[in-house]
Amino acid sequence: KWIMVGRLDVNTSGLLIFSNNGDLVQKLSHPSSAIKRYYLCRVFGNPKKSQIKKLLNGVEIDGNKSCFDEIIPMKKKTNAKNNWFKVSLHSGKNREVRKLWETESLQVSRLIRIGFGPIELPEDLKKGQYRCLEKNAVERVIKLTGMEG
């Protein structure tokens, strides 16, 4: 039986990971695993440096402190209606990326998960396609959890 690691909400696309090892899925999915997730975000508007700083230092969401580990602008356009950012965070709470931006009154208009720990979404992999991980990639993922291979 294949089990999905975490999930993507209805308005998010990108990398999905499946495994037939329930213990591994549990360890990878749980927020306490602190495995970095990487996303491309299209944000409506032009965030100020002060807003970016707040999102990196931490804001309160649903009674808990949350922050991005990094926010990297992609092709900065000062007068653009939308701007793309590569972001990473180490927890996987429900809609966390969107909620973080929303604390600064910024709306995410597109969200794509491009990485989960050492696994990256291949650029040549089209929507709806899949690819099995190489053995060394599986071993790196297992090592992240502290499980034996």
Which residues are covered by each model-predicted region?
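Basic, flexible Lys/Arg- and Gly-enriched helix-loop patches that mediate nucleic-acid binding at interfaces
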Residues: 1-149
